[in-house]
Amino acid sequence: MNNAVKEQLAELGIEGYLNQHQHKSLLRFLTCGSVDDGKSTLIGRLLHDSKQIYEDQLAAVHNDSQRVGTTGSRPDLALLVDGLQAEREQGITIDVAYRYFSTQKRKFIIADTPGHEQYTRNMATGASTCDLAVILIDARKGVLDQTRRHSFISNLLGLKHFIVAVNKMDLVDYSQDRFEQIRAEYLEFSKHLQGETEIQIIPLSALEGDNVVEKSRLMDWYQGPSLLELLENVDIDRDKSSGAFRFPVQYVNRPNLDFRGFAGTIASGVVKVGDKIKALPSGKTSTVTRIVTFDGDLPQAQAGLAVTLTLADEIDISRGDLIVLESAQVDSTNHLLADVVWMTEQPLQVGRDYDIKIAGKKTVGQVKAVRHQYDINNLSTYHAESLPLNGIGLCEWTFTQTVALDKYLDCADTGGFIIIDRLTNVTVGAGLVRDSLQNITGQTESFSAFELELNALVRKHFPHWQAIDLSRLGKA
């Protein structure tokens, strides 16, 4: 038991502590930035100064600091996060490391992401579940290519809150001029980011603890809050509940003949008993009669809650369908534009079939064309025929089924999909819907009947050849 928990138990008692803890909001955030900007040290300092470290953990850090530490005689707090042996020996982060802690105001899950360009896929994976990004900048080096790259990926993945932490201020004598110079440089770069992003910029020193949990006496020219205060007070619940109601059906719950409900997690918005809804892609309508949870029925439910909805009418709804309000305008298409983050050594192939999972629905899709690939260091684009490992590009997709979806920036759960290799069942990429295109319905005779039959035979008996389906290349 750490000191923070001991203090809260002594003040509130067990029942009071559990009740308070249960009703705290949860903030998921990631730390990112260039190599050696101090991401792991910052998390270690945050955990240490907020009294979240157990005594045996602190003792282990003291011992490990003598062997692989980088802070001299002082304990290397980065070792609280860098768990892999290779990370500790190299002094870098390779995998995404997750840490949990809580304060009296809020619960937190931290994703410590790697800074190296070859681990872009790891960083994208960490960002996909977060609400906020803490982007570190070394006060000595300023805004680097990797800073721009991580800002771009975080923005691409829909994060609407950035805290830019100008770290290592102790190494520039806590200079206000240097901080203002970096602040102006980053704000100028941020004009190229899409959507509305709330950006807070703060000077700190993770090694010394300045402006991490407590305000710094050495930077009295900075009048804003500390990092922990910013994390405790950022409003993320408004973002989740302000969107349109989206409910991807994960399971049809039929325990007996008298009950039929549709289970899932509300992706965005709010639903109330009595709301008129429609199911997509069928378009059938009904009315919500109950909102069932483990703790009993609710009059209304908002984004993030796992619920079971019962309806007034027996309409056909199955796993993968999307329930929305009757008045909602939702795109249903099999043809779309999506940004793709590629995560495997074998490049993305135009025309090859991949399994697609989007909001509980499974279908098959293929890339008709790569519109462009991003240079994620300077946000420019260039022509590409495919996407390599860690490549990010805008692709034109076709699916075998019509899918109800949103733009990723509007709703991540119904606008994001994963791409799976059909032979190995390995997740090879992630897609972020940019826009829907006109449905593809027709097919032209581009190949002879013999060519199509031979192609089907090869794909059936020699799947490891990964032959392209010719019958789909002729779709208009």
Curated annotation (Swiss-Prot):
Signal peptide: none annotated. The keyword Magnesium does not apply. Pathway: Sulfur metabolism; hydrogen sulfide biosynthesis; sulfite from sulfate: step 1/3. It holds the Pfam family GTP-eEF1A_C. It comes from the Bacteria. Residues 33-40 are annotated as: G1. Residues 112-115 are annotated as: G3. Heterodimer composed of CysD, the smaller subunit, and CysN. PANTHER family: TRANSLATION FACTOR. This is Sulfate adenylyltransferase subunit 1. It comes from Vibrio cholerae serotype O1 (strain ATCC 39541 / Classical Ogawa 395 / O395). The lineage of its organism: Bacteria, Pseudomonadati, Pseudomonadota, Gammaproteobacteria, Vibrionales. The gene is cysN.
